[in-house]
Amino acid sequence: MDKKKKTSKAPPVSGFLARFRGFAQACAVLLTNPHLPNLLKGQIYRGKGKTVCVPGLNCYSCPAATGACPIGAVQSVIGSSKFKFSYYVTGTLILLGVLLGRFVCGFLCPFGWFQELIHKIPLPKKKLSTKKLRPLRYLKYLILLLTVTLPLIFTNEVGMGNPFFCKYLCPQGVLEGAIPLSLASESVRSALGSLFTWKSVVLGAVVVLSLLFYRPFCKWLCPLGAFYALFNRVSLTGMQVDAHKCVHCGRCAKACKMDVDVTKTPDHPECIRCGMCVKACPTGAVSFRCGLSRGAKEKENPAGKQAVEK
């Protein structure tokens, strides 16, 4: 009898999610931005859909957008209790965090998908790892803190906050908003100034970094990702590892581009539930979970000391 651990597949649902994540991301982008003709007209959709926040980072000013950006909405109304919309936005984000956590980042965020597409562009040199840059991941929590507190301090005469993140740092605003609007409208082009130049530099920097690193904005700068990360350990959607199947080969950790070892911390704040670990696992030990169950706990597994059959 062969002493080596035989390979096996992940549960059907987990395998499906991991295999077709790219398709799910594309569908999420289209559902978030269905008003494609507006891109040619240079017009922003202002229907009832704009009263609903989408889960991922998607600019309100995008001509094709059907919903509001949660970060922009929070900054605009968090400074005053006069706006009932502020309670709705906060409640929506908390609900998404509890239900999905950073699954939103891995499957539903348009800007996250954009960075992944850029990262797939082949370069002469090997893609760089961000493992040595892990301390930078805490920067997004500082940005989240400033994103929430600054609009509380600086409000206009009607109590609306100044959206500092959207105004000075968010590259998605340039990519989805300013660029398509300026291409379609001469008046918008003539109104562009130093702020557009600065944010174009920010977008350009993110594009260059995305060529070298996997989702750098998500890892280091995104306040929305930082918010969802706070819920990763309690969210109903996440990852789990079957200790009885795990052979501790380390393939899942090597496959993870978010620098997470799922066998040690299945619900790590940096995990975006992308499923790369599911595809890499030779024994089907790693899978998605949905619900309160956290799966089998880690314990000594004699098979883990044996080599995995290649």
Where are these predicted regions, by residue range?
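Non-ligating segments of multi-cofactor redox enzymes
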Residues: 1-263, 269-310
